Amino acid sequence: MASAPNPGPSATTAVLASVAALGIWRLLAVAAPHLAALVLMYESETDFGARLSFVLAWGILNFFWIALLRRPALSGALSLTMVVVLVLLSRLKHDVVQMTANFIDLMMIDRDTVAFLFTIFPNLRWSVIGAGLVTLPLMYALWWLDPFRVRRLPALASMLACLAALVGYSLYHPDEAWRGYYDDGYLSKFFRSGVSAVSDFAQYGFMESAASTNERLNMPLVDACHPAGRRPNIIMVHDESSFDIRAAQGIKVPAGYGSHFKSWDGKERAFLAESNGGPSWFTEYNVLAGLSSRSFGRFAYFVTRIATGRVERGLPLALRRCGYDTMSLYPAYGGFMAARSFQVTTGIERFLDSKDLGAKDVEPDSFFYDKALRLMGERTPNKPLFTFIYLGANHFPWETRFRPDLLPNWRAPGNVPSIDEYLRRQAMSAEQYNAFLAGLKKKFPGEPFLIVRYGDHQPEFAPGILEPGLDEGALGKKLDAYDARLYATYYAIDAVNFEPVKSEAVMDTVDGPYLPLVIQEAAGIPLDPSFAEQKAIMLRCKGIFYGCKDGAEARRLNRLLIDAGMIRGL
């Protein structure tokens, strides 16, 4: 009897044989990045839409590298490396400014930003070099281990399919801006923000402005300003993270707290900032350019960098036309958010950053006040001076005691340690400001000074104590809606040998972009046509700027400034 035919190896046996031939390590090299990404997705993405966006973004990255390299193992490793770096940077950004990274961060990165990071983190350069020395051999090993080769055309088609799906989903279901305050969804929010950013840029560019009109502003003439009476020296003080904490219920404050927020006439006045918790440069744009960062929409985070060389309008320029010299003392490196370039664009003639001033680290307010007194003594005789003093001692974190040697008799009121430290630093600021006023009177007897101080934004913990019953999402929605309670700080006007001019512009509550107007009015400086127009807006809108008529007044003023040549390329 003939033997039965041999059916050959089973399908399972064939697969196992193939695996054995390829080697388990080679297969793991291909699979491991995808498994790691899967774990990361479940850890960082919170809902179906975010996870779908993560998968599509992961597909875009992988198929991009496969189309370029044809090796899926190396492509997966490169994609995973990019995602991990993004997550780390996003978490760092959230720790600093309470917002995660988005696509616009990538759009706006430049040499100044990289130089600033390497300067403030001196070990970062070596960390990058070390990471490169470790990563490059690993990538070469993956190149050698990878057993697969994928054709470029199918990979490119797959990448475009993932991109089309992500764009379609993002347009159909755009990510709400308030979700940026959540410390999650790093990859999905980054890619979806790219769709929104490109859409917004195509619609109105970097900055909103109204359609062209027949209205025109006259360009102000140089030295065409002739104020009545003696022009005071003007000092504007940027009071870092300062607001009246009594706005929150249940906070214990030391005796006498609150006097620092009063003006020369005994009144307390409110300043409505356009940021909360971190980005001081929003307010820097407000008080120097006299315009709204909110006009830049999703691009507002980079407002000073975008405005550099483009927005040639502001308080320093207006004062220079009235014969003032202009000077700025800045507590960080001048490359940070293009601070030096931006301030020069708005009319600052002499910009001194922390390196120029000899600052060793975060310095107390007295350091900058003492430097200002010395520098003001070097000014041109009989010529008024505008000085912008940018303070930083009350910057977060408040978990550590700043300069324990200062204010030795301080007694904590009995709040949580971070709030007590915040109050301690406010007390230091008040004491050192009073010493600065005394220094002005002693060093410049008989000379007139107008001093205007403002809190640039509330501290990062403020929303939680102002609205203790709300979770992170509800607070994010209130912040996104610009609830005034979460943006209110203070502004105060003081004077030495000068009586501030009474003006209807010196209101009890003003939006940040109106502060340059308030300063000029209080100093008795004639307004140029652009500020005269802005004063009319201020009176019509009762101290509200961007929020008036859903931004229509701000867009109209932007258009007038564009047509007058004060704003270019936006």
Regions found by a protein language model. Give the residues of each.
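Transmembrane and membrane-interface helices of multi-pass
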Residues: 1-187
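Generic structural signal of hydrophobic/aromatic residues within well-ordered alpha-helices
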Residues: 36-37, 113, 117, 198, ...
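A broad, low-specificity signal for short, low-complexity segments enriched in glycine/proline
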Residues: 74-76, 91-96, 196, 287-289, ...
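General structural signal for secondary-structure boundaries
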Residues: 97-105, 119-126, 202-215, 280, ...
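Membrane-interface transmembrane-helix boundary segments in multi-pass integral membrane proteins
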Residues: 115-131, 190, 198-202, 419-426
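Membrane-interface segments at or immediately adjacent to transmembrane helices
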Residues: 168-238, 248-249
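Solvent-exposed soluble domains appended to multi-pass membrane proteins
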Residues: 223-226, 236-239, 244-570
